[in-house]
Amino acid sequence: LWVSIENEEKDDDDDPDNWWYYFGSNGKAYKRSDSASNDVSLKTINGKKYTFDEEGKMQFGWVADGERQTDDDAWQNCDYYFGDENDGAMTVGWREIHIVDENYEGSQPNDDIWDEDQDRWFWFKSSGKKQTDSVNKNINGKKYGFDEYGRMIAEWYTETTYVDKDTT
């Protein structure tokens, strides 16, 4: 049973108006166990995977160490993305996500890819972990590239091979 409870501690725009909780058939809220040692502690509900904190609040957006991350660089430091505040299901497959890249190099004016505020595509494996550092990742028969933070490389990319002139 899903229950939405007003967030009485909301103090900034990153906080949700309501927190979602899930109560199992035993009447207890799903919570992250104190012994959870991995980045996220997953619970499957109606075929979708969710993560909750120690208080039972459904986590959403970028999540690391069992907690929601709201810093502008969360997309760089986190491996898992759990939808928005009303559907915190773990993302698997393609997802376009709005990010803020404070280290962008604005070399192309009026280009969305080179703007600090960006909508970028990410690929999340079946484990929910984002794909990173891959130039020739085969997904559904097509090849894609991803940078060290998991953004799909949206520009033209040419792989260069060097030959040592002394070996010919």
Task: Give, region by region, the residue ranges found by the protein language model.
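Extracellular adhesion/carbohydrate-binding repeat motifs centered on closely spaced tryptophans
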Residues: 1-168
